[in-house]
Amino acid sequence: MKTATCSLLICVFLLQLMVPVNTDGTLDIIGKKKVKELLAHQDNYPSAVRKTLSCTNVKSMSKWASCPAGMTATGCSCGFACGSWEIQNENICNCLCLIVDWAYARCCQLS
């Protein structure tokens, strides 16, 4: 009985690892939240200069993904279902799990 239960738990765990993750959707949601936060704290005076927000994804085959010069990391996504990450120096995504095969950084620039 113990062997069957253990085998079942292992099968369930392996099936969870096989479920695909929609990283682009997750990064877009995080980016939109960040933009809303930035816009909520701007001055109430109309700007004479029109600003545009441009964003891109940067993929790395390691635990770190760096944004291009002049861009800021607004969110991260990590491989092997790692949900633990941090942004360092405003432009580097660092995945905090022990085993990670890729990292995405959502990089944006307001110009």
Swiss-Prot record:
It is found in: Secreted. The keyword Cell membrane does not apply. InterPro entries: RELM, Resistin-like_sf. Probable hormone. Plays a role in pulmonary vascular remodeling. It holds the Pfam family Resistin. One of its GO terms (molecular function) is hormone activity. Highest levels in adipose tissue. Keywords: Disulfide bond, Hormone, Secreted, Signal. GO terms for cellular component: extracellular space. Disulfide bonds join C55-C108, C67-C107, C76-C93, C78-C95, C82-C97. Residues 1-23 form the signal peptide. The keyword Signal applies. This is Resistin-like alpha. It comes from Rattus norvegicus. Monomer. Belongs to the resistin/FIZZ family.
